[in-house]
C-alpha cells in the first residue's frame, strides 16, 4: 500500500545555481547557438546514449582563421564543476584539447565573419554520464584566450516525471499567474534520503533567471514525491513573446517597419511595441531564434548582420532589458533599453544575424530578480512552456546525475 505523508516541516537541501547560462567573453563571438539535434525550440537536453547530437555553433566576426579548442566539463546540479570525478568517468575519448575543425567564411556579406560548428559526440569524444555539461572554447592562436562557455544537459531517464500547469493558483485564479504541479516517481532509483539525494529545478521557457530551485514537496510517498499547490511553484504568466524576422537586407519582412543602409551598415527597425492591455493569442517561439535568409540556403555563411532597433512604448518603470535565448538569458548593458523622456518610450539596438527572433521585455530589480513590464501585461492564458529537471546522487556516489526531465505547455 502506498503511504502518503503531508510535509509539515522538512529541511530540503538548498541548491544555489551558479552560472548555467552561456557566457561570451570575447567581442569577436556572436550568434552562439546550442541546440539538441535540430530542435531549436527546446532547451539543450539530450538523452544519454541516444543518436541525437548536441550542436554548438558560433560566428567569429573576422575572416581570419583561428584554431579553436574546447574543454568539456561535467558539472553538479548547481553548475559548479564536478570535483569528485575524473574526466574518464564522464567522457570516452578526450575531455580537452580537441579542435573545432568545421569552419567556413561568410560569402557576400557586409559584416565579415567565420562560422564555426561542432557536434558532441564526435570521433574524438562522447559522453558516458548524465548531468550538466559546460563546454569552454579557447583561442589557441591567442595564448588560449577563453572565448565563451556553452551549457547543455544529458539525461538518463531513471525516474518518471510528470508536470501539470494550472491557472488556479494560490495567488489568483485565471488572472496573471500560473502554477506548476510536479510528481516524481523514483522508478529504479534507490532513494533513502530524498532531502539530500534529490534536487529539482523548474524552468519557465528554459529561463534560468527565474528558475525555482529545490522547492519543498508537499507529499512524500514510499516511491516518490509530489508538489501540489506549492506557492513556491507560482510564476508570473507574462505575455506571449514578441517576434520579428529579417530575411532580406533590402526589404521588410515580418515585424519590421523598415530596413535601410546608412552607407556603412544595415539597420532594421522593429515596429514600435505598443502597450498590450488585453491578451491576444499570437504563436511564438518562447524566446528562441533561428538563423536563416530569404533563400533559406547556406544560412550559416550567407546571412548578414544588421543593427536591430527596438522601441517599447511605456512610462519609465525602472531598468528594462531585452530577453530571449539569443541574449543567453543574461542582463548585460548591450541588452538594456534606454529611456527617452521626449518620446516617452524605451529604446535599444542590438546587432543580430538575419533570421527569426522572439523576445520579451523584463524589468531587472536591484535584487537581481526579474518581472514582466506592466505595459506588456501578464495574462493567465499565456502559452508558456515549463521544464522540470531532477538530479540524483546515490549513497556513496561522487556527483549529481540528471535522472529525469519533462516539458509541458499550458494549453
Regions found by a protein language model. Give the residues of each.
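Ligand-binding face of N-terminal immunoglobulin V-set domains in extracellular IgSF glycoproteins
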Residues: 110-140
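Contiguous beta-strand segments within globular domains
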Residues: 31-76, 173-186, 295-310
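Short acidic/polar inter-strand loop motif in beta-rich domains
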Residues: 77-79, 125, 139-147, 207, ...
Amino acid at each position: 500500500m502506498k503511504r502518503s505523508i503531508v510535509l509539515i516541516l522538512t529541511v530540503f537541501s538548498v541548491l544555489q545555481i551558479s552560472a548555467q547560462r552561456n557566457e561570451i567573453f570575447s567581442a569577436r563571438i556572436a550568434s552562439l547557438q546550442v541546440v539538441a539535434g535540430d530542435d531549436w525550440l527546446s532547451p539543450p537536453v539530450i538523452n544519454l546514449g541516444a543518436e541525437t547530437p548536441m550542436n554548438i555553433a558560433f560566428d567569429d566576426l573576422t575572416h581570419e582563421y583561428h584554431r579553436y579548442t574546447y574543454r568539456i566539463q561535467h558539472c553538479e546540479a548547481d553548475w559548479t564543476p564536478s570535483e569528485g570525478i575524473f574526466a574518464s568517468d564522464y567522457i570516452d575519448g578526450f575531455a580537452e584539447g580537441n579542435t573545432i575543425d568545421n569552419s567556413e567564411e561568410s560569402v557576400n556579406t557586409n559584416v565579415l565573419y567565420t562560422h564555426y560548428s561542432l557536434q558532441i559526440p564526435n570521433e574524438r569524444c562522447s559522453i558516458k554520464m548524465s548531468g550538466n555539461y559546460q563546454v569552454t572554447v579557447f583561442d589557441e592562436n591567442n595564448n588560449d584566450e577563453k572565448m565563451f562557455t556553452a551549457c547543455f544537459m544529458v539525461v538518463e531517464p531513471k525516474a518518471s516525471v510528470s508536470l501539470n500547469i494550472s491557472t488556479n493558483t494560490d495567488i489568483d485564479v485565471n488572472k496573471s499567474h500560473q502554477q506548476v504541479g510536479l510528481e516524481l516517481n523514483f522508478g529504479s532509483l534507490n532513494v533513502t534520503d530524498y532531502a539530500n539525494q534529490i534536487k529539482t529545478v523548474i524552468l519557465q521557457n528554459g529561463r534560468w533567471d527565474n528558475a525555482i530551485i529545490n522547492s519543498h514537496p508537499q507529499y512524500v510517498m514510499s516511491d516518490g514525491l509530489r508538489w501540489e499547490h506549492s506557492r513556491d511553484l507560482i510564476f508570473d504568466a507574462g505575455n506571449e513573446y514578441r517576434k520579428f524576422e529579417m530575411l532580406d537586407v533590402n526589404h521588410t519582412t515580418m515585424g519590421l517597419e523598415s530596413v535601410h543602409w546608412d552607407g556603412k551598415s544595415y539597420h532594421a527597425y522593429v515596429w514600435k511595441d505598443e502597450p498590450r492591455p488585453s491578451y491576444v493569442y499570437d504563436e511564438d517561439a518562447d524566446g528562441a531564434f533561428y538563423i536563416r535568409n530569404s533563400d533559406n540556403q547556406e544560412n550559416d555563411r550567407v546571412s548578414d548582420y544588421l543593427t536591430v532597433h527596438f522601441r517599447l512604448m511605456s512610462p519609465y518603470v525602472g531598468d528594462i532589458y531585452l530577453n530571449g535565448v539569443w541574449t543567453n538569458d543574461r542582463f548585460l548593458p548591450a541588452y538594456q533599453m534606454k529611456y527617452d523622456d521626449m518620446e516617452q518610450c524605451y529604446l535599444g539596438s542590438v546587432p543580430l544575424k538575419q533570421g527569426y527572433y522572439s523576445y520579451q521585455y523584463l524589468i531587472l530589480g536591484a535584487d537581481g530578480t526579474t518581472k514582466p513590464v506592466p505595459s506588456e501585461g501578464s495574462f493567465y492564458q499565456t502559452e508558456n512552456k515549463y521544464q522540470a529537471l531532477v538530479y540524483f546522487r546515490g549513497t556513496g556516489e561522487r556527483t549529481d546525475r540528471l535522472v529525469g526531465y519533462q516539458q509541458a505547455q499550458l494549453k
